[in-house]
Each structure stands twice: as structure tokens, then as C-alpha cells.
């Protein structure tokens, strides 16, 4: 049970890292999105926490792939939300569809991992 909670924490940190890296790039390089220091702070703290987890815990088989998928999901979700808020950037159809596909893929992989652990 404790390992499952640690795995979920790693996946959540990867999602937040994806959100914050896209937010940082949007805040720094997009003239449409207003500047904010909070995505930068969030990115630094998230990367630090992920690095500490990497140093202090072993990652089970399959978790790095799920963490990468959660990171990509965070990037896509931020892009979808920003494009919905600022339609001048472009359509959010493609990131929204990819986000839904990623959510279902992550859910299927997590369900398979849970069944493998139960056996």
C-alpha cells in the first residue's frame, strides 16, 4: 500500500512538472500569456522533489513510462487550458484529443499494474 501511494506521488509530481514547464515557457516566451513567477517556482520545486525521489527510492518496472506519460499529459493539459483562455493562440482541439487519449492510456496501464501486483 505504501509503495502504491509513493508511485501515485511520483506520477502526480510528473504531471505537475509537465504543467509547470509549459507554464514557464508560456510565461517567458509568449506575448499573449501574462508573466508570472509561480510556474517557475513550481517547476523548480517539482524537479527538486522528483530528483529526491529518484535518489532515495527505487522505481518499479513500468513506472518511468507512466511518469513520462503523466509529464506529457501535463504539457498537453496546460496547452489546452491556455488555448481555451486565449483563442488567439490557436485551436485547442488537437491537445484536448491527445489529452483524452493519454488519460485513457494511463488509466489502462495503471489498471494492468494493479492486476499484476494483485497476482
Curated annotation (Swiss-Prot):
Q: In this UniProt entry, which residues form the Cytoplasmic topological domain(s)?
A: 1-8, 51-61, 109-119
Q: Which Pfam families match?
A: DUF1422
Membrane-topology annotation of the record: Multi-pass membrane protein
Quote the disruption phenotype from the UniProt entry.
Answer: No alteration in fatty acid composition.
Span-the-membrane segments of this chain are 9-28, 32-50, 62-84, 89-108
Q: What is this protein called in UniProt?
A: Inner membrane protein YijD
Any ranges marked Periplasmic in the topology annotation, and which? 29-31, 85-88
The miscellaneous comment for this protein is: Probably part of the fabR-yijD operon.
Amino acid at each position: 500500500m505504501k509503495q502504491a501511494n509513493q508511485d501515485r506521488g511520483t506520477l502526480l509530481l510528473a504531471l505537475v512538472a509537465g504543467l509547470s514547464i509549459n507554464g514557464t515557457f508560456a510565461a517567458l516566451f509568449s506575448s499573449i500569456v501574462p508573466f508570472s513567477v509561480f510556474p517557475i517556482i513550481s517547476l523548480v520545486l517539482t524537479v527538486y522533489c522528483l530528483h529526491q525521489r529518484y535518489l532515495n527510492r527505487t522505481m518499479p518496472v513500468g513506472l518511468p513510462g507512466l511518469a513520462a506519460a503523466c509529464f506529457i499529459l501535463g504539457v498537453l493539459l496546460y496547452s489546452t487550458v491556455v488555448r481555451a483562455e486565449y483563442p488567439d493562440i490557436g485551436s485547442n482541439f488537437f491537445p484536448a484529443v491527445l489529452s483524452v487519449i493519454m488519460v485513457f492510456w494511463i488509466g489502462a496501464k495503471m489498471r494492468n499494474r494493479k492486476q499484476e501486483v494483485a497476482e
